[in-house]
C-alpha cells in the first residue's frame, strides 16, 4: 500500500501529503527511508504491575491456564479484563470454561441470596459477560466486545493480537497474556505457507501490558516465567 501511494505521489499527485501512523513500527527506519520528520504523540499511561507465572505453561493447555487466571484475577481486582490468546480455537475453548464457571458462581450466589427481585437483579449484574474478539467475528459481535461496559456491568474480552494496537477497549484494568500468537511461516520444502503458534516478542508483550494502564493503574498477568522472558526476541 505504501509503495503504491508513493508511486501515485511521484507520477500523478506530487502535491499529495502522506502520513504514516503506527504504534509499533520502526519509526527511525521509515523516517530515514522516506526522508520524513518524526512526530510522536504519547498518551497518558498509568503504572501497570506485572505478575509472572512460576512455571512455563504447555501450549496445548494455555487456554485452561488463561481461564483459571482470569477467574482468579476477577475475584481479586476490579475492572474489565482483556486476555490475549493465539487464535480463535483457544478463545472459544477458554470462553466455554469461563461461561460454565461463571454460571455456576451465579447460581450459587442466587441460591444463597434473598429470592427478592432486587437481590436477583444484583446477582446478575455481578456476573461478568464474556466476549470473544478475533478477525473472523461478525462486525456486530466485535462492537459488543469493544463497547464500554455499562454502569454496574463487567466484561471479559478474549482476543487475538487484533486488540494489541488495532482496537481500543475502554475500561480494561487487567490483562492476561498467554505469550503466544499465530504467525504465517513459509516452508521452503513444500513451497507453502502455514500458520504456526509461536512465542511473542518483548515488544508485543509490552504492547499488551499497556492495555491495562489506559484509564487507571492496572495489572498484567504474564503466563511465562521471568527467565523465559530473557529468551524472547526484542
Outline where the language-model segments fall.
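P-loop NTPase motor module signature
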Residues: 2-234
